[in-house]
Amino acid sequence: MNFADTNWLEAMFVHIDEERQRRVVVERFHRRHPGMIGLSHIVLLETRNIFSRITGSANPDEWQELQAGFSGRFYLDPMNWDLLRRESFRLFEKYSHQAAIGTFDTVVLASAILAGAERMLSFDENLKALAVAEGLEVFPELSKEGLAFLAKLKRRA
């Protein structure tokens, strides 16, 4: 299953000039890879906040459009908080001493792993590097920055 990060959803739904290049990447991906996109409640919480912040609207149309996708476009993993905490702690133990991993990135990845994700859809290089370190595919591919972060994650202490 493909699993989307907040910045992927932002590129899908928010029509601002700064996101145009990302939007083209997202649209091309979905034409080539149709099917459901996995989301977690963690991503959904951040997306709700970001959509209002970017649009300046208390209840943005983009949020309504995303919610309409729960009738077949998106799969919202029910998420078990105890399992999420356990998986996040596992990732912290494995990588926090290797590189400065973000707490939120780690929790997003933990939720993707628990949801059965095979591919992470994101524009965040650190999150994608962490996903690759855990055996997930990523799209778009890692940049030089992401590959450098991945090398830090793979160092042996």
Predicted regions, residues:
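Short beta-strand scaffold positions
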Residues: 4, 38-39, 79, 103, ...
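Alpha-helix N-cap/helix-start capping motif
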Residues: 7, 41, 82, 124-125
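Short, well-structured N-terminal submotif of metal-dependent ribonuclease cores
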Residues: 1-42, 54-65, 134, 149-150, ...
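Acidic, metal-associated active-site segment
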Residues: 6, 102-119, 126
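Acidic, PIN/NYN-like endoribonuclease modules and their adjacent C-terminal/linker elements
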Residues: 1, 76, 115-157
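Hydrophobic/aromatic ligand-binding patch that stacks against planar heteroaromatic rings
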Residues: 29, 111, 130
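Acidic catalytic patch
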Residues: 71-97, 106
